[in-house]
Amino acid sequence: FTGLGDALIMLGLRYDTPEARAKATEISAFMRDRAYLASVELAKERGAFPLFNADLYLSGGNFASRLPAEIKEQIRKHGIRNSHLLSIAPTGTISLAFADNASNGIEPPFSWTYTRKKRMTDGTHKQYSVEDYAWRLYKYLGGDMARLPPYFVTALEISAQAHEEMVAAVAPY
């Protein structure tokens, strides 16, 4: 879920608000639906995964049983290529390496800037500055860095309850 915190910032939504949770829910549902539809398309080309059984896969009480009716219909008709589709992996280093340091994981960044220490192959360490992507973009666009807008919040500035509410908003997807 790399970048959710920064995406909400760039949409002008404060992370710990009902509006941000609604947008995160919308994003999560979209990602889920597109992942399942892509797997159906792959099943059309290559067949369903070997142990696929539509009745068991779509039976009540499991994740796939909560999919929209039109997606379940496509799965029943064509099968699904991937037995597992969605997971949220740890994304701290991944966001730095591949996402230009967009907020890592589901939460907003823990800091707008920090120093990262990297061990080199020769055993020495190199320190370098890291800036959050949304913060850096705001600065580049001429934003007032002395007074960030209220939707710029770090993970440390929001309550544990707000973290929990965001997880609850996206967990069904």
Feature-to-residue mapping (PLM):
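Short, electropositive, low-hydrophobicity segments enriched in small/polar residues
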Residues: A7-I9, D16, L96, Q127
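Glycine- and acidic
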Residues: I9, L13-T25, R119, R147-T154
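Internal maturation/activation junctions in enzymes
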Residues: L13-T91
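Catalytic alpha/beta core of large soluble enzyme barrels
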Residues: G61-N62, Q74-R81, L86-Y173
